[in-house]
């Protein structure tokens, strides 16, 4: 993956972007990994994020997620999260396997490194965003 490390110096992140970020301490404890993560930005500061039966709702409106395959949706019980000011809610696209904000909370703006703009591996997934 290639990420634009400068974009968030000038622009606010947008919902749906794939973001590289420094892992918060809770993520290191819950996921057993540290350093950086790559996840999709789902919730913006002030949003209420609810996941019910594999569907995500932002402020009680269904979020269109054409990038999530039906077999990758998580069927956990309903979860509700309020995104604090200056923080972002991240989720992986493979919801059943992803260790993300549902497990360890939101990500502070200062932890955002950049937006992914190109994928070059594996070769069958080469794309520009």
Identify the residue ranges that each predicted region occupies.
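Soluble "head" domains of membrane/secretory-pathway proteins
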Residues: 1-129
């Amino acid at each position: 993956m290639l990420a634009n490390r400068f974009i968030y110096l000038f622009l606010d992140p947008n919902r749906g972007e794939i973001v590289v970020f420094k892992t918060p301490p809770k993520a290191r404890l819950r996921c057993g990994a540290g350093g950086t993560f790559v996840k999709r930005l789902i919730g913006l500061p002030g949003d209420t994020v609810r996941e019910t039966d594999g569907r995500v709702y932002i402020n009680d409106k269904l979020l269109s997620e054409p990038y999530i395959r039906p077999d990758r949706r998580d069927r956990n019980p309903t979860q509700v999260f309020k995104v604090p000011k200056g923080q972002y809610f991240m989720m992986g696209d493979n919801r059943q396997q992803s260790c993300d904000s549902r497990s360890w909370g939101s990500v502070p703006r200062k932890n955002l490194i950049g937006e992914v703009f190109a994928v070059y591996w594996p070769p069958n997934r080469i794309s520009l965003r």
